[in-house]
């Protein structure tokens, strides 16, 4: 298998895309055979995106009361959780958190809201005002994740200064009905297309450990390749009490790393970040993400769960002799 991996690596570096069948073969590797996979995934990453690390941070700008029934989500109105519930925060709060994110070393800052979408009145106006101020007052790059949007909203965000629109597919099309039944997968795909049409970059990934099969992870990666997204956040389920998946078993650290490597093999030139759930799922192997193909991570807190201190992540990078890159590079 090592010879096969080496041959695939050469083809990928020369600009060829691996096939669905080849990706499935890689997904079946296990045990010590995974180490050569991590090694070549790292080589591919360094060839296409270098060895620097992209750091991002977010604000949960509007929390809870979401009408969607995503099985993993603490903010769904269909679940009874301890997640905070509040309306869209004010402009000053969004800007202040951007300053804090920049202070912590992030180069990209995401404004995230719960719900299917935002309204085009006061909510959109407030977010656009905040984005303009963030552009004026900081050196951080603003992004937004506001749910399903239409072209008019996408243009307004682009005009305000939003660099990247974030919208996850969450999982493979074939598994999506097991995760969410309140909207269709194609609506998420269309949002990605709309954001790109408006001139924004697109950050689009998903969450693993929902009960999907490893071949379905490959399926999702191939969909992202077809959509030609710019960056891919990989999240790993941190089961929240009160959600449908509260009793789910975490996937192993090695399976997390294998998933990262698979995505790098399928999406060689994309920015791939490991975000939510890394502390819970990777545990002592968190630092290995950067040697399995990841090129970034989120620092600070997540939407409804606490991340570790930014100082700890900076120490991790220092120990690995890695430095941070600007997300616009």
Curated annotation (Swiss-Prot):
E.C. numbers: 2.8.1.6
Example of a GO MF term: biotin synthase activity
Domain Radical SAM core: 48-278
Cofactor binding comment, as recorded: Binds 1 [4Fe-4S] cluster. The cluster is coordinated with 3 cysteines and an exchangeable S-adenosyl-L-methionine. Binds 1 [2Fe-2S] cluster. The cluster is coordinated with 3 cysteines and 1 arginine.
Catalyzed reaction equations: (4R,5S)-dethiobiotin + (sulfur carrier)-SH + 2 reduced [2Fe-2S]-[ferredoxin] + 2 S-adenosyl-L-methionine = (sulfur carrier)-H + biotin + 2 5'-deoxyadenosine + 2 L-methionine + 2 oxidized [2Fe-2S]-[ferredoxin]
Domain of life per record: Bacteria
Xref: SMART domains: BATS (SM00876), Elp3 (SM00729)
Pfam families tied to this protein: BATS, Radical_SAM
Pathway: Cofactor biosynthesis; biotin biosynthesis; biotin from 7,8-diaminononanoate: step 2/2
Protein keywords: 2Fe-2S, 4Fe-4S, Biotin biosynthesis, Iron, Iron-sulfur, Metal-binding, S-adenosyl-L-methionine, Transferase
PANTHER family, per the entry: BIOTIN SYNTHASE, BIOTIN SYNTHASE, MITOCHONDRIAL
HAMAP family assigned to the protein according to its UniProt record, in alphabetical order: BioB
Subunit structure: Homodimer.
Family membership noted in the UniProt record: Belongs to the radical SAM superfamily. Biotin synthase family.
Protein name: Biotin synthase
Organism of origin: Geotalea uraniireducens (strain Rf4) (Geobacter uraniireducens)
């Amino acid at each position: 298998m090592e010879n096969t991996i080496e041959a695939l690596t050469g083809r990928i570096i020369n600009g060829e895309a691996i096939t669905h069948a080849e990706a499935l073969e890689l997904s079946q590797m296990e045990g010590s055979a995974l180490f050569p996979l991590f090694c070549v995934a790292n080589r591919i990453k360094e060839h296409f995106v270098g060895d620097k690390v992209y750091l991002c941070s977010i604000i949960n700008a509007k929390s809870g009361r979401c009408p969607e029934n995503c099985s993993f989500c603490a903010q769904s109105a269909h679940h009874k959780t301890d997640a905070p519930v509040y309306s869209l925060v004010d402009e000053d709060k969004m800007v202040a958190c951007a300053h804090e994110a920049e202070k912590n070393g992030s180069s990209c800052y995401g404004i995230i809201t719960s719900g299917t979408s935002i309204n085009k009145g006061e909510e959109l106006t407030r977010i656009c005002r905040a984005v303009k101020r963030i552009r004026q007052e900081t050196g951080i790059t603003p992004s937004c994740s506001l749910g399903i949007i239409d072209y008019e909203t996408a243009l307004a965000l682009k005009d305000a200064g939003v660099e990247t629109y974030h919208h996850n597919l969450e999982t493979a099309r074939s598994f999506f009905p097991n995760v969410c039944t309140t909207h269709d997968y194609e609506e998420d795909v269309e949002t990605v297309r709309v954001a790109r049409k408006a001139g924004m970059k697109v950050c689009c990934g998903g969450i693993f450990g929902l009960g999907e099969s490893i071949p379905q992870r490959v399926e999702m990666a191939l969909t992202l390749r077809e959509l030609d997204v710019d960056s891919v956040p990989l999240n790993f389920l941190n089961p929240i009490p009160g959600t449908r998946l509260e009793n789910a078993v975490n996937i192993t650290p090695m399976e997390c790393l294998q998933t990262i490597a698979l995505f790098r093999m399928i999406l060689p030139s994309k920015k791939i970040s490991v975000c939510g759930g890394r502390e819970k799922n990777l545990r002592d192997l968190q630092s290995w993400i950067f040697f399995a193909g990841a090129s970034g991570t989120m620092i600070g807190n997540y939407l409804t769960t606490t991340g570790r201190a930014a100082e700890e992540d900076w120490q991790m990078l220092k120990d690995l002799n890695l430095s941070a890159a600007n997300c616009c590079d």
